[in-house]
């Protein structure tokens, strides 16, 4: 599954680069955002550990007059892990802006861990966009935005949700509870409630009970919209300090797999010479 995902992701990234009219010889700066000392936030730095960087080789060859010895099937790539302001005392954007101004890459790829709004998305999806990224915004610690408008070069942001807050966990629990109730009532023709396990492959939406049933079991909370429920839960949990940010207990091994997946896909997409055999 990881290999299949890597192949699909690398192909989609190639298409994205083509869509942005980024040429094969365009220089790239890969930025790994996040705190390397906090596992679920270390996606960016971990990805950089396996990125093939070549900019220094081009610089050395240029000084020694040996550019003709460089394999043009390897793009000029550099990498940067700016850390977080709590460790460096410097705004992440300022570090990136300075490096971009000095090295002048043609485009940026920024990798970061995200906060999910649903438990089902944690470590299960890859987000890719050309609209930039605001570091820390998912956990209420918004920093200055990193995008094409502010830096003057195309910015492709890649993220994987690795954490989720208690509001989302509680919201999803209520939603799943309602679907369990709906399934039980449907199987018993509405005469008796008896819980049974829902298969992960089931279409859960089909089990969502009617508004009247939701109100019967949960009162006014049962008829609130998704956003209204989120807002209510946030108003209850946040002031009490209970809106914790959580991550799966298997995060160490999953981060190792996910970071390797992303770095391998980036290497294939950025360097035409690189291929992975099945």
PLM region spans:
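Gly/Ser/Thr-rich loops at beta-strand to alpha-helix junctions
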Residues: 33-41, 86, 113-117
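Glycine-rich beta-alpha loop segments
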Residues: 24-32, 36
């Amino acid at each position: 599954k990881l290999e299949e995902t890597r192949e699909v992701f690398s192909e989609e990234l190639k298409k994205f680069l083509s869509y942005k009219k980024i040429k094969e010889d365009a220089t790239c700066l890969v930025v790994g955002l996040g705190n390397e000392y906090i596992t679920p936030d270390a996606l960016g730095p971990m990805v950089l550990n396996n990125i093939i960087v070549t900019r220094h080789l081009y610089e050395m060859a240029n000084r020694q007059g040996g550019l003709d010895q460089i394999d043009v099937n390897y793009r000029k790539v550099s990498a940067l892990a700016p850390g977080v302001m709590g460790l460096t005392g410097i705004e992440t954007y300022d570090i990136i802006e300075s490096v971009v101004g000095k090295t002048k890459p043609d485009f940026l790829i920024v990798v970061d861990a995200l906060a999910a709004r649903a438990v089902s998305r944690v470590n299960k999806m890859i987000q890719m966009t050309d609209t930039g990224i605001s570091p820390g915004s998912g956990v209420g610690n918004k920093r200055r935005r990193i995008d094409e408008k502010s830096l003057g070069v195309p910015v492709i942001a890649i993220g994987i949700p690795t954490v989720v807050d208690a509001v989302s966990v509680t919201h999803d629990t209520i939603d799943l509870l309602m679907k369990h109730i709906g399934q039980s009532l449907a199987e018993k023709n509405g005469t008796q409630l008896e819980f049974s396990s829902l298969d992960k492959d089931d279409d859960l939406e089909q089990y969502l009970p009617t508004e009247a049933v939701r109100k019967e079991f949960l009162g006014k909370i049962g008829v609130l919209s998704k956003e209204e429920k989120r807002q209510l839960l946030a108003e209850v949990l946040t002031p009490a300090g209970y809106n914790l940010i959580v991550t799966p207990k298997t995060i160490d091994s999953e981060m190792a797999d996910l970071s390797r997946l992303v770095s391998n896909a980036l290497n294939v997409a950025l360097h035409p010479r690189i291929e992975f055999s099945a």
